[in-house]
Regions:
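A short, N-terminal "cap"/entry segment at the start of jelly-roll beta-barrel domains
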Residues: 1-66, 157-166
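Short, surface-exposed coil-to-beta transition loops
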Residues: 66, 86, 124-126
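Conserved hydrophobic/aromatic beta-strand scaffold that supports enzyme active sites
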Residues: 68-72, 90, 111, 119-121
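Short, charged beta-strand/loop "edge" motif centered at a coil->beta-strand transition
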Residues: 69, 78-81
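Glycine- and acidic-residue-biased ligand/ion/polar-headgroup-sensing regions
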Residues: 75, 85-105
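Short beta-strand His + acidic residue motifs that chelate non-heme Fe in jelly-roll/DSBH
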Residues: 80-82, 91, 100-102, 121-122, ...
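Short acidic-glycine-tyrosine-enriched beta hairpin
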Residues: 104-125
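Double-stranded beta-helix
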Residues: 129-166
Length: 166
């Protein structure tokens, strides 16, 4: 029953994102903390228009392309305490409330709560953790690749701490 409710939330979120005209090129609803939708990179400006109040993607580019994504975090779940070598990120809370911890080093600071519409920027190498609070949280994110010749991918995650032993 719980698995069905979880999958229903993911499918409902996927259909909502598709109803905005976005093409989902891949998805993963099997992460221990929730799941994600990867949006066609050619739709980065439309994604920014919809979720980031129309920030011009040229202003977001650091080195090369941008990669839009939707994160869905389960209640009472946490992504790993992590950072990236080849990307910065910009996030906007789309649905619900989430907790976020950020730090310039491996020390976890206090969690701050964010609500729908709040925007968060993460620099390359900045430690961060997304936390699901009392309900599902949905976050729109754009990867800002920092290495034009070697764009970031799902392997570009340095996990400092992980609740799931990864």
């Amino acid at each position: 029953m719980l698995l069905r409710l979880k999958m229903n939330y993911y499918i409902k979120t996927q259909k909502l994102v598709e109803s905005f005209g976005f093409k989902i090129v891949s998805k993963d609803f099997q992460r221990p903390w929730g799941g994600f939708l990867v949006i066609d990179e050619n739709q980065a400006q439309n994604f920014s228009n919809h979720f980031f109040k129309g920030i011009n993607i040229e202003d977001l580019k650091i080195s090369g392309k941008l990669s839009p994504k939707i994160l869905i975090v389960k209640p009472d779940s946490r992504l790993s305490w992590q950072y990236h070598h080849r990307r910065a990120e910009i996030w906007r809370v789309f649905k619900g409330k989430v907790g976020i911890i950020k730090s310039e080093d491996d020390t976890e600071n206090e969690m701050k709560a964010y609500s729908e519409g709040d925007q968060i920027t993460l620099t390359q190498g900045e430690r961060h953790r997304l936390i699901g609070l009392d309900d599902y949280g949905v976050v729109a994110e754009i990867w800002q690749h920092t290495d034009k010749n070697n764009p970031s991918d799902e392997e570009d995650i340095v996990r400092v701490q992980d609740d799931f032993g990864r």
